[in-house]
Amino acid sequence: MKSYRWLTLSAALGITVLEAWLFTAASASASQIDSHSTDNAADSGQALYSTYCGACHQANGEGMAGAFPPLKGSGVVNRADATKHIDIVLGGLQGVRASGVTYSNAMPAFAATLSDAEIAAIIDYERAAWGNHGSLIGPAQVASERARLN
């Protein structure tokens, strides 16, 4: 009887160790996937920013004096509610005044050029880069705002 008891306890211990190992392996894989997805989204946002925004707002987000406003430290970019930020990217903007400076050059509208996912990636990049701390968004939020504006 004692040998069956030890056998049962050994089997239970073995199963517990196996479950713990499988759980740890699955958690590590999920973590790697999440990290990889986040890295890809950030890379995508940075690449899209470089293509569509960087010439005017510059790679460092500081803009061009008197021509294009900075995104680094921008009130619109750092606002908790991203609606205005989305509206500007979708609809463009001209004659903006920021920090006491008027920027006369026009920003084109990207509603017809970029998808909701691309706009979200750019905005998320801008809201996280250069020390900015705006809340991040997703394609669904861009789609909702696009529908509201149409």
Residue ranges and their predicted role:
Residues K2-G14:
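Bacterial N-terminal signal peptides that target proteins for export
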Residues S3-W6, L22-A26:
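N-terminal targeting and processing segments of secreted/endomembrane and organelle-targeted proteins
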Residues I15-F23:
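Hydrophobic alpha-helical membrane-insertion segments, chiefly the h-region
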Residues F23-L48, G63, G138:
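Electrostatic cytochrome c docking/interface patches
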Residues A30-H36, R97, V101-N150:
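Flexible coil segments in periplasmic/lumen-exposed cytochrome c-class electron-transfer proteins
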Residues D39-M64, V77-G91:
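Sequence/structural segment immediately N-terminal to covalent heme-attachment motifs in c-type
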Residues A65-P70:
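Short cysteine/histidine-rich zinc-coordinating motifs and their immediately flanking basic loops
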Residues K72-S74:
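A short beta-alpha structural unit
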